[in-house]
């Protein structure tokens, strides 16, 4: 069969292909939480030899332990303790990285009740030692994620000791939007390179 220029064969596009073409890349579309997406991002950085950043284990308080056997101990009652520092830490190009991650379904502000005084103190201590410290803030309803330097968070917290929510306008003015992707899903190192180190990790 000869296909003349005035009558080209049109390739059929299935509804699924149309959906995949126009759908925004978002970890939520894969049924992932914000935390899981960050963990996957860190695993990507580690596998590629880019950075070594891990989630800190949540501390627990053991209340009751049973000993069914002399050589075995079984925890039967425990509860999570309030974290004294931040969620993640590690190293990238010789720089100490330390950050917290928060998510909200609100559209106009990030609740400051999500941050505790000892976490703010920890971030200030990291900055004093010249570490790179920040928070990743995800607005689930808006599908927007921001990198906010720790100094901007600390400055806002000190206004009224964290009793009011942080407006999205403040975050946009003092932070940087993280464009979500596939590999990695939450490419926050892009912000560190572009805004603070002036290079490119690729």
From Swiss-Prot:
Gene: recU
Keyword Nucleotide-binding: no
Keywords: Cytoplasm, DNA damage, DNA recombination, DNA repair, Endonuclease, Hydrolase, Magnesium, Metal-binding, Nuclease
The keyword Metal-binding is annotated on this UniProt entry: yes
GO biological process: chromosome segregation; DNA recombination; DNA repair
Reaction it catalyzes: Endonucleolytic cleavage at a junction such as a reciprocal single-stranded crossover between two homologous DNA duplexes (Holliday junction)
Annotated organism of origin: Streptococcus equi subsp. zooepidemicus (strain MGCS10565)
GO molecular function, one term: magnesium ion binding
Protein name, UniProt field: Holliday junction resolvase RecU
Protein's cellular compartments: Cytoplasm
